[in-house]
């Protein structure tokens, strides 16, 4: 035990001092341990502190210092070597951390000294941001005022209201003493005071347009400060006021006003401007700010746009009023034209009936007289009467057809017919006339043409008769050739009509007919008027040629209705001409058989016993027409009973009558109603006579009405003996006849 050195010798200690050191070290340790906690809290909460790692070093230093003081509590009494080692280690660590922290502070202190400089920099930045925010707020305020002013300006399209609203809103927004608008005069040489803020009816002051201040303002799109003593700034008297307010002026473009004939604005051929003048309150230190000038400039542009819109509105309203007036006038003209067309149609209908009735008598009696024994001189006179009457009847038909073509009421009568028979019919009609003039006429119908086609047989015959008839009429000698074939696309082109390009299909084709003669020919300058109604070329319109000038005009319209084209070629006078027309025809479905019977051949028998004992009832209100028709029927051997009214016809008709001829235009009970009554009287078909309308109306409506009431046929006056003979033959053979 004596050799044991477990306890090192210690200094004797004062108990009171020891107690105070104990307490002091304890509280020092508590303080050292609490400060790192506070630093940790600061590091977590501070997002912008740049030296967090320095705070960590401070924390470690303080913790080690606290640990040193805490360990030191055990060194006041006797303690072991272990406590001494721990104490020494703690002090070494504290010394190391303290030195590192001290070295780091050498580098940090300059940065900490620059914090003040940064603070000043940040303050300057903050002040600059405040100024920018103030500018932004000013711009927003200006924008709000602009939007408000724009809304007020555009709330109306009346230009006087626009200008007055602009001045009022600018005066209220900017606190103006006066605001005025100068407009150019009609001559454009002066500006006139048109609107002011304070004066209800401003006197029309004017200033010359060539003033330097005006040129200065007009040459810039910005608001310009001008002298309060300028002529355009003297808006109000300055009595009792010492310092006039600042004045600015800005131009207002008059956009596109040259396109609008505003009554009280000048007609501006070049770009001109109005001028807006704004005055701040007098006797005040207020000045114009930049944002206020920008506001004025924007408002001036908005006023220009609003005035342009107002001008457009005024022009559109004027155009609308003018259009309404024109529509009223056009509607009145249309009604007058419709009235005139109806009057013309009524006149033509009446004249058609009134002319055909005597023509019927002339042609019928002439044809009857022609079949009697006459001397050669008498026969020549009768033939002349008959030819002249037929020519007059043709002229009547042409006039009526042209009238219906022009008002669009004429429509094609589409049916299946024998195309080859049509060519033979035309050839047989024209050949005798050509023989008299010693003309040789040839007909060449291509085998590729279908025998039966779908189209308007009557109009096709009329076209061919007009074209071939003209060739015969205007040729004194030579040959006339008629050629017909299926048209190919390359053979129907006419350089004068490049838009006409026909295309055939499986059930339709185009037929080309070419009529070439060696007649008088045509002057090239007369070509354009050949298809004009009542017009003929000079070499053609000879005194012996005859004709009304309607044939080609009507033929052209018929060809157009058939989706075709017609043209004429001639090398000049005395060199003949070639007329070519192309029409579209349909191909019947199924077998190539006729859907309608062919025209029966004309009987060569001119005896009076063609229809011996055939009982016929004739009803015609016109006495002459009734007598003439009765004579025709009796000449053909018919047993005729004639009556003058529908009531008498209804009373006289019986089963013994085989045919009833009736005029459909009679007073009281007309022909259509009479046909219905006859159908009601004879319910059985074999007991009912055949009903045929004998009419002067050649329109399609008459035919449709007759079909509707059950008539078996329609015959157009005038009627000759041969025509009546053919009519009865076809009627009795087929029990139906509707003359084309």
Swiss-Prot record:
Q: Where is the GAF domain?
A: 158-307
Query: Which PROSITE patterns is this protein grouped with?
Result: HIS_KIN, RESPONSE_REGULATORY
Residues where 4-aspartylphosphate is found: 663
* Class in the EC hierarchy, top level: transferase
What's the catalysed reaction?
A: ATP + protein L-histidine = ADP + protein N-phospho-L-histidine
Q: Where is the Response regulatory domain?
A: 615-732
Per its record, how is this protein called by name?
A: Ethylene receptor 1
| Source organism | Pelargonium hortorum (Common geranium)
């Amino acid at each position: 035990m004596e050799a044991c050195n477990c306890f090192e010798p210690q200094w004797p200690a004062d108990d009171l001092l020891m107690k105070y050191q104990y307490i002091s070290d304890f509280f020092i340790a508590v303080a050292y341990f609490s400060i790192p906690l506070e630093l940790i809290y600061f590091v977590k909460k501070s997002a912008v502190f740049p030296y967090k790692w320095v705070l960590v070093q401070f924390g470690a230093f303080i913790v080690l210092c606290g640990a040193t003081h805490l360990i030191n509590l055990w060194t006041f009494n006797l303690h072991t070597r272990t406590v001494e080692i721990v104490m020494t280690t703690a002090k070494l660590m504290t010394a190391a951390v303290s030195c590192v922290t001290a070295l780091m502070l050498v580098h940090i202190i300059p940065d900490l000294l620059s914090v003040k400089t940064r603070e000043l920099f940040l303050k300057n930045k903050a002040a600059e941001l405040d100024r920018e925010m103030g500018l932004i707020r000013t711009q927003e305020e200006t924008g709000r005022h602009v939007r408000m002013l724009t809304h007020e300006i555009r709330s109306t399209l009346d230009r006087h209201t626009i200008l007055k609203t602009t001045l009022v809103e600018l005066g209220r927004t900017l606190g103006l003493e006066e605001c005025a608008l100068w407009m150019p005069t009609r001559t454009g040489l002066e500006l006139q005071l048109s609107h002011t803020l304070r004066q209800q009816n401003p006197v029309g002051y004017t200033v010359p347009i060539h003033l330097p201040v005006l040129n200065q303002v007009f040459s810039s799109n910005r608001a310009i400060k001008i002298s309060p003593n300028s002529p355009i700034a003297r808006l109000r008297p300055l009595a009792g006021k010492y310092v006039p307010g600042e004045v600015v002026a800005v131009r207002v473009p008059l956009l596109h006003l040259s396109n609008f004939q505003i009554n009280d604005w000048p007609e501006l051929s070049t770009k001109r401007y109005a001028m807006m003048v704004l005055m701040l309150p007098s006797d005040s230190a207020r000045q114009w700010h930049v944002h206020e000038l920008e506001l004025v400039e924007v408002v001036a542009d908005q006023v220009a746009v609003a005035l342009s819109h107002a001008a457009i509105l005024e022009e559109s309203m004027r155009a609308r009023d003018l259009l309404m007036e024109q529509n009223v006038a056009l509607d009145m003209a249309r009604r007058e034209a419709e009235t005139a067309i109806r009057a013309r149609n009524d006149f033509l209908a009446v004249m058609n009936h009134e002319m055909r009735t005597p023509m019927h008598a002339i042609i019928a009696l002439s044809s009857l007289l022609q079949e009697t024994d006459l001397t050669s001189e008498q026969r020549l006179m009768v033939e002349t009467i008959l030819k002249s009457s037929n020519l007059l009847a043709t002229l009547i038909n042409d006039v009526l057809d042209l009238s219906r073509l022009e008002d669009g009421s004429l429509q094609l009568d589409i049916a299946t017919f024998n195309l080859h028979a049509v060519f033979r019919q035309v050839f047989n009609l024209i050949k005798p006339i050509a023989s008299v003039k010693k003309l040789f006429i040839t007909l060449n119908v291509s085998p590729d043409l279908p025998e039966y086609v779908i189209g308007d047989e009557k109009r096709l015959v009329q076209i061919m008769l007009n074209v071939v008839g003209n060739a015969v009429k205007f040729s004194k000698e030579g040959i006339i050739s008629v050629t017909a074939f299926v048209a190919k696309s390359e053979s129907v082109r006419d350089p004068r009509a490049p838009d006409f390009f026909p295309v055939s299909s499986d059930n339709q084709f185009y037929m080309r007919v070419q009529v070439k003669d060696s007649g008088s020919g045509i002057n090239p300058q007369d070509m354009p008027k050949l298809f004009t109604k009542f017009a003929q070329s000079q070499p053609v319109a000879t005194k012996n040629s005859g004709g009304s000038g309607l044939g080609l005009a009507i033929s052209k319209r018929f060809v157009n209705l058939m989706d075709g084209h017609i043209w004429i070629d001639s090398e000049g006078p005395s060199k003949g001409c070639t007329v070519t027309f192309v029409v579209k025809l349909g191909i019947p479905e199924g077998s190539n058989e006729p859907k309608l019977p062919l025209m029966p051949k004309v009987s060569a028998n001119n005896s009076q016993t063609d229809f011996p004992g055939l009982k016929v009832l004739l009803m015609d209100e016109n006495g002459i027409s009734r007598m003439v028709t009765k004579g025709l029927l009796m000449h053909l051997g018919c047993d005729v009973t004639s009556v003058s009214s529908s009531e008498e016809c209804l009373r006289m008709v019986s089963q013994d009558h085989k045919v009833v001829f009736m005029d459909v235009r009679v007073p009281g009970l007309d022909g259509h109603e009479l046909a219905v009554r006859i159908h009601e009287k004879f319910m059985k078909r074999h007991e009912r006579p055949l009903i045929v309308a004998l009419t002067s109306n050649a329109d399609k409506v008459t035919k449709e009405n007759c079909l509707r009431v059950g008539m078996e046929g329609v015959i157009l006056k005038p009627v000759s003996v041969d025509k009546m003979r053919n009519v009865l033959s076809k009627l009795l053979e087929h029990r139906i006849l509707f003359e084309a």
